[in-house]
């Protein structure tokens, strides 16, 4: 008969395979998958499972990372982003909508698909940047915007996007924004994701 693990060993295994457990894992490659042989967990993110919205967003972030990451690639930046985003979801200082927008913008930037928000896409000017075009993948100055379809955004929203794109992941969640900036940021990311990320994330069915 097949030997069964003891209840204590089973409890350890369950804790190590908690969906939000972060730590160091030792694995060996089986025929069709990797098998965990040892784990040293630093953070279980237990608070996430107590909040349905936070948990559904955390699952979305993990699903997003799984979609973008490639096996045997160096995906440390995405892993760092997941970790910091989970921490932000547990912090009541940050709205979940802001955490989602920050995660999405940083994740697509890590993947090389982020927008250009530091200079006009047409004339390369760095002043009077106020018009964002999803289809063109970036920002335009007031003069060049006359020939482009898109939306006007505030300086504060542009600064926020520049900060998210350029700041190391470890310092990413260190700010809050006004309702107006959050509204614009959410609108941009909703349209940008719909245009560039062609995937139906199942976990979003809960959070919306």
Question: For the regions a protein language model found, what residue spans apply to each?
Answer:
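Short nucleic-acid-contacting surface segments enriched for D/E, G, S/T with interspersed K/R
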Residues: 11-23
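Internal, conserved structured core segments that host functional sites
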Residues: 50-110
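OB-fold/S1-family single-stranded nucleic acid-binding modules
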Residues: 33-44
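C-terminal, charged interaction/regulatory segments at domain termini
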Residues: 92, 96-208
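Single conserved hydrophobic/aromatic residue that forms the stacking wall/gate
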Residues: 1-5, 9, 13
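Generic beta-strand structural signal
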Residues: 21-23, 63, 128
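Flexible glycine-rich surface loops and low-complexity tracts that mediate binding to linear polymers
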Residues: 20-32
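A short, structural micro-pattern
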Residues: 17-19, 33, 135
């Amino acid at each position: 008969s097949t030997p069964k693990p003891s209840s204590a060993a089973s409890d350890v295994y369950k804790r190590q395979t908690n969906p939000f457990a972060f730590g160091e894992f030792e694995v060996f490659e089986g025929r069709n998958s990797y098998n965990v042989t040892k784990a040293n967990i630093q953070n279980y993110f237990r608070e996430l499972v107590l909040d349905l919205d936070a948990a559904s967003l955390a699952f979305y972030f993990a699903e997003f990372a799984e979609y973008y990451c490639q096996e045997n690639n160096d995906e440390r930046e995405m892993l760092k982003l997941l970790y910091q985003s989970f921490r932000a979801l547990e912090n009541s200082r940050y709205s979940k909508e802001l955490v989602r927008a920050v995660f999405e913008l940083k994740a697509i930037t890590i993947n090389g698909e982020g927008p250009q928000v530091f200079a006009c896409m047409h004339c390369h000017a760095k002043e009077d940047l106020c018009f964002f075009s999803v289809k063109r993948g970036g920002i335009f100055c007031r003069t060049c915007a006359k020939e482009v379809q898109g939306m006007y955004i505030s300086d504060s929203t542009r600064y926020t996007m520049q900060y998210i794109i350029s700041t190391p992941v470890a310092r990413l969640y260190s700010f809050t924004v006004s309702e107006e900036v959050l509204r614009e940021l959410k609108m941009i990311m909703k349209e940008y994701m719909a245009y560039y990320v062609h995937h139906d994330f199942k976990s979003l069915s809960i959070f919306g």
